[in-house]
């Protein structure tokens, strides 16, 4: 049964946190696994956060039926998907088409990022730096260390790290294969997305189409939700332009939410099976108000310091962390609950964990445990 959405212009329907949770999980392919291809899923989700090499594979395993990691690896090898810095200055796995459109959309944010490094770039002509770096990486993909040394030869008084950050911000650089491939990753080597794909990037697009796609994957959502996800500013006018095509709701705090008229909004009581998400899954990062997935009491509890861990969704909400260790041929998956779990929840989590270990590791034996490995210092 779908959630009720009766409303008037003066009194939009209020969507509860559970209603938002179920709607978002459905669109994120986490309420039930989808039969879509890996490439279609990467496009539907507007990319997979990929600052580490393995999480994109686990993101797709959590969302797709019969997912084979080699499918995504083959897409990388054929250059149908690429690893490129886009949203929130973070490396993402995108389809080739999205890499050529989303990067221009967020380019202004990447250039604003350079202000943080202006002291280390004193005396550096940024236009010339971009030209020099582009010539270097188009000649052949360059490891980061080599690119840094080449740039430092031109600007010996500049901060070496700031020079490579500037190249990354000014140019749409991709990490070429074998980096990021399943089971056979290599060092980071960079070239431009246009050179790697053999076609030019698109002109800077209007955000309208991206807003609609975002709502299809993360909605219902507010203007601020979109801005946090994309790291864009001044997009309220875009939502106003799209308003005649959208439905509007309110959350329990009174914040206006926008949504596609035909998007799924399941009944809040719809069962949500346990799902194991890797570190930095965009589900957990794609909104300004993350309480639709992360209970307030668990904010910031998917890691300690700079170390992030996987998140377990239990009844649709982040209520446990997980990690995998190897002991010889045994894969040991430890789940640390953040609340008391009933027997049925533990059984369902154990079953899902065992399936994941079978599909995503080459271990001959699996051991699923409930225990404590994170000390939050409470």
Task: Tell where the protein language model's regions lie, with residue ranges.
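Long, low-complexity intrinsically disordered regions
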Residues: 1-290, 296-378
């Amino acid at each position: 049964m779908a959630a009720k959405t009766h409303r008037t212009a003066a009194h939009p329907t209020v969507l509860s946190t559970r209603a938002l949770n179920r709607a978002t999980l459905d669109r994120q392919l986490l309420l039930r696994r989808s039969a879509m291809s890996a490439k279609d899923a990467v496009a539907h989700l507007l990319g997979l956060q990929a600052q580490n090499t393995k999480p994109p594979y686990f993101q797709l395993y959590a969302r797709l039926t019969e997912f084979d990691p080699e499918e995504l690896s083959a897409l990388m090898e054929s250059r149908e998907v690429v690893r490129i810095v886009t949203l929130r200055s973070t490396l993402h796995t995108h389809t080739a088409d999205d890499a050529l459109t989303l990067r221009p959309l967020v380019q202004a944010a990447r250039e604003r990022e350079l202000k943080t490094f202006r002291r280390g770039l004193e005396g550096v002509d940024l236009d010339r730096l971009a030209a020099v770096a582009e010539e270097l990486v188009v000649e052949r993909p360059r490891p980061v260390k080599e690119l840094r040394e080449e740039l430092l030869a031109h600007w010996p008084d500049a901060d070496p790290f700031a020079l490579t950050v500037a190249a990354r911000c000014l140019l749409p650089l991709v990490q070429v294969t074998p980096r990021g491939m399943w089971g056979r990753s290599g060092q980071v080597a960079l070239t431009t997305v246009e050179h790697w794909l053999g076609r030019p990037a698109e002109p800077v697009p209007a955000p309208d189409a991206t807003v609609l796609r975002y709502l299809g994957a993360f909605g219902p959502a507010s203007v601020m939700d979109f801005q946090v996800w994309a790291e864009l500013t001044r997009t309220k006018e875009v939502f106003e332009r799209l308003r005649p095509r959208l439905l509007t709701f309110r959350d329990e705090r009174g914040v206006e939410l926008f949504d596609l008229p035909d998007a799924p909004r399941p009944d809040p009581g719809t069962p949500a099976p346990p799902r194991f998400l890797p570190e930095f899954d965009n589900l957990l990062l794609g909104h300004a108000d993350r309480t639709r997935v992360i209970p307030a009491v668990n904010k910031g509890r998917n890691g300690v310091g700079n170390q992030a861990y996987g998140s377990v969704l239990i009844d649709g909400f982040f209520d446990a962390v997980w990690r995998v260790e190897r002991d010889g041929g045994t894969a040991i998956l430890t789940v640390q609950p953040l609340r008391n779990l009933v027997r049925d929840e533990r059984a369902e989590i154990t079953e899902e964990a065992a399936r994941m270990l079978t599909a995503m590791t080459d271990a001959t034996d699996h051991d699923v445990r409930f225990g404590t490995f994170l000390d939050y210092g409470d």
